[in-house]
């Protein structure tokens, strides 16, 4: 069955190449620039491009603000987060901007428009208050009622299923949801936004300022309404009750998206009042949201840290197209590197642990908090005390909030930093929150990746917390472990922990040469390309080193960092954890999740209990976590 007309975008198959359609406008600007020998500031073609950029930034501003959970968590209308399904559905949210820019280009390039001089003379006038008055009048008397009745029509069969249902695909709105729709809906919005402008220009009182001001204010109000964050104080409506019928709120719009039978207006609820579709609980709910009554304490917290400056931009409140895919050095982020560097310095001076993302699992709220420190700072001796203070404050805050389990990420549990979390547990024995390093499950993931027919392995980082546990576990399986370490004292200490009959399977090596015939390398310490050359062809590098080693050898294979896929019933997950694939988290994160789901009452800090590796692994599988 053929799709209904105006229900799909003609450039849908182009993907990101759709932006080539701006080429004609760019060419016009370049041509005028060449002819004038300077920037064509009086060109409508240039203004079309500038307006497109300004509109995109408006939506991005509200999107970023709405996803800064450390600012907005308490005033979110719907507390849940956006999931990957919604991210993908709204991927081409800016189609309406492209459509309206092309319509504008058609008008600017139209011989009839040029001949009647409807647009071009207005460039000489940046501001005309009469035009603003006319535009406001036409917006209230024409645009608002037109949108209201058209919107109500779109909610009736068969128009809803054909054209509008996709826009209501999720109850959690974002500013990008505002732009997500069919061509028919976008054409309707084009008429609604264009009527006041057309009226002002036809009356000869249009101006450049009116175009920018009206369009950007329109986008600003739509973005605000879809932001899912309540920004208008209820005191404003209490002081001036009439205002509640003149301006909508994010709560007002959210009710429409969830219930679908009320609150149809564009910006002015008075039209819902006149049309009998006003949801009367809008302002009471708005008050509750603004006062933070929707707020909920998390049940589980994963305490992460920033890896580096580029990775600091891989967060939900920067670019969703980047944060919803595994981290990579996207060229589009390079111009923002100086800004990110400035924020690094700012956080170093005066920031504290903050909330980055959240999801739900079986009715429980899981959050990721981030210590405002970057990877390199963990190796500065003078920074050690400050980092531990940040982690300690986060643990105490979680304890006050009633968090059940807090899991430490990567460098936050560094042995030299705080003994794998023992520092905090010993200092605060009365803690109710369980502190977990998650390394038991990390070890289990690495060990279960090793083929069952392997007879010997080469282990770097052999005397680390993970290296020790892996070596002791493998020797019990009668697998020979070549432990690379220069410290005989550390090696012997680990060897003595093994049962006497298995100690022979632990072998100390001080160089890479003994591993020339071993095809299973367990990498817990960084390997340079030169060191990797000692591995024979066909070697597989299993990794538990941060950051992961560079895949230098083409005749070898490289495993990823230990990770697990969250259960299928996870909700509100729309963010990729560093280089992990969608739905996959680091094993130490997963270890904390398992600890919480099992309801274990002990802290998991310090040395790894080798006897619990299989216990934790089986518990993870039981709860639906799977190897990534």
From Swiss-Prot:
Cell compartment(s), UniProt: Endoplasmic reticulum membrane
A Pfam family hit: FA_hydroxylase
GO BP: any one term: aldehyde biosynthetic process
GO-annotated molecular function: aldehyde oxygenase (deformylating) activity; iron ion binding; oxidoreductase activity
Gene induction: Induced by drought and abscisic acid (ABA).
Phenotype upon gene inactivation: Early leaf-rolling at the reproductive stage. Reduced wax accumulation (lower total proportions of aldehydes, fatty acids, alkanes and alcohol) in leaf cuticle leading to an increased cuticular permeability (e.g. chlorophyll leaching) and a subsequent altered drought resistance due to rapid water loss.
Membrane topology: Multi-pass membrane protein
Transmembrane regions listed in the UniProt entry: 37-57, 131-151, 191-211, 299-319, 331-351
Keywords, alphabetical: Endoplasmic reticulum, Lyase, Membrane, NADP, Transmembrane, Transmembrane helix
Domain Fatty acid hydroxylase: 137-277
Record GO cellular component, one term: endoplasmic reticulum membrane
Entry EC no(s): 4.1.99.5
Top-level class of the enzyme under EC nomenclature: lyase
Catalytic function, reaction form: a long-chain fatty aldehyde + 2 NADPH + O2 + H(+) = a long-chain alkane + formate + 2 NADP(+) + H2O
Cystine connections: none
Major localization class: endoplasmic reticulum
Tissues with expression: Expressed in germinating seeds, radicals and leaves.
The protein's assembly and partners: Homodimer.
Family membership noted in the UniProt record: Belongs to the sterol desaturase family.
Biological role stated in the UniProt entry: Aldehyde decarbonylase involved in the conversion of aldehydes to alkanes. Core component of a very-long-chain alkane synthesis complex. Required for the formation of wax layers conferring cuticular permeability and drought tolerance.
Protein name (database record): Very-long-chain aldehyde decarbonylase GL1-2
Species, as recorded: Oryza sativa subsp. japonica (Rice)
Organism taxonomic ancestry: Eukaryota, Viridiplantae, Streptophyta, Embryophyta, Tracheophyta
Gene assigned in the entry: GL1-2
């Amino acid at each position: 069955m053929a799709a209904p007309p105006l229900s799909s975008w003609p450039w849908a198959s182009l993907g990101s190449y759709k932006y080539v359609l701006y080429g004609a406008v760019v060419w016009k600007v370049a041509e005028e620039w060449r002819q004038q020998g300077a920037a064509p500031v009086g060109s409508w073609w240039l203004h079309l491009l500038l307006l497109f950029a300004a509109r995109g930034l408006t939506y991005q501003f509200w999107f970023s603000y709405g996803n800064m959970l450390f600012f907005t968590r308490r005033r979110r209308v719907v507390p849940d987060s956006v999931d990957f399904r919604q991210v993908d559905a709204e991927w081409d949210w800016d189609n309406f901007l492209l459509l309206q820019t092309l319509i504008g280009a058609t008008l600017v390039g139209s011989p009839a428009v040029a001949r009647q001089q409807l647009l071009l003379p207005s460039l000489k006038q940046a501001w005309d208050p009469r035009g603003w008055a006319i535009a406001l009048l036409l917006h209230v008397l024409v645009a608002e009622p037109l949108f209201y009745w058209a919107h109500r029509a779109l909610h009736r069969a068969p128009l809803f299923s054909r054209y509008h249902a996709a826009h209501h695909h999720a109850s959690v709105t974002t500013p990008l949801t505002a732009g997500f729709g069919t061509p028919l809906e976008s054409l309707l919005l084009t008429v609604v936004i264009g009527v006041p402008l057309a009226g002002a220009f036809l009356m000869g009182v249009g101006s450049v300022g009116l175009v920018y001001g009206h369009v950007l204010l329109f986008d600003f109000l739509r973005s605000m309404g879809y932001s899912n964050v309540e920004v208008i104080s209820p005191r404003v409506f209490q002081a001036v009750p009439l205002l509640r019928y003149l301006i909508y709120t994010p709560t007002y719009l959210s009710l429409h998206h969830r219930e679908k039978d009320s609150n149809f207006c564009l910006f002015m609820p008075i039209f819902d009042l006149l049309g009998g579709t006003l949801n009367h609980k809008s302002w009471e709910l708005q008050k509750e949201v603004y006062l933070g009554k929707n707020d909920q304490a998390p049940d589980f917290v994963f305490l992460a840290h920033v890896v580096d400056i580029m990775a600091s931009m891989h967060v939900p409140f920067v670019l969703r197209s980047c944060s919803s895919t595994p981290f990579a050095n996207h060229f589009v982020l390079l111009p923002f590197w100086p800004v990110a560097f400035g924020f690094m310095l700012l956080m170093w001076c005066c920031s504290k642990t903050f909330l980055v993302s959240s999801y739900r699992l079986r009715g429980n709220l899981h959050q990721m908090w981030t210590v405002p420190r970057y990877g390199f700072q963990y190796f500065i001796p003078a920074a050690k005390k400050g980092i531990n203070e940040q982690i300690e404050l986060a643990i105490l805050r979680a304890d006050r909030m009633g968090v059940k389990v807090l899991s430490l990420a990567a460098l936050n549990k560094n042995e030299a930093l705080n003994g794998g979390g023992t520092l905090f547990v010993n200092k605060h024995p009365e803690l109710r929150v369980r502190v977990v390093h998650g390394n038991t499950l990390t070890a289990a993931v690495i060990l279960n990746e090793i083929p069952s027919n392997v007879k010997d392995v080469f282990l770097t980082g052999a005397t680390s917390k993970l290296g020790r546990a892996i070596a002791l576990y493998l020797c019990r399986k009668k697998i020979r472990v070549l432990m690379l370490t220069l410290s005989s004292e550390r090696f012997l200490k680990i060897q003595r922990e093994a049962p006497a009959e298995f100690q022979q399977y632990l072998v100390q090596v001080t160089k890479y040469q003994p591993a020339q015939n071993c095809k299973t390398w367990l990498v817990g310490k960084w390997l340079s390309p030169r060191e990797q050359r000692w591995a024979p062809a066909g070697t597989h590098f299993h990794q538990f080193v941060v950051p992961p080693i560079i895949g230098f050898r083409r005749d070898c294979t490289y495993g990823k960092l230990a990770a697990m896929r969250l259960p299928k019933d996870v909700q509100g997950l729309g963010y990729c954890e560093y280089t992990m694939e969608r739905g996959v988290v680091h094993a130490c994160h997963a270890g904390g999740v398992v600890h919480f789901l099992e309801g274990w009452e002990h802290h998991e800090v310090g040395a790894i209990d080798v006897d619990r590796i299989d216990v934790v692994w089986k518990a993870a599988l039981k709860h639906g976590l799977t190897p990534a």
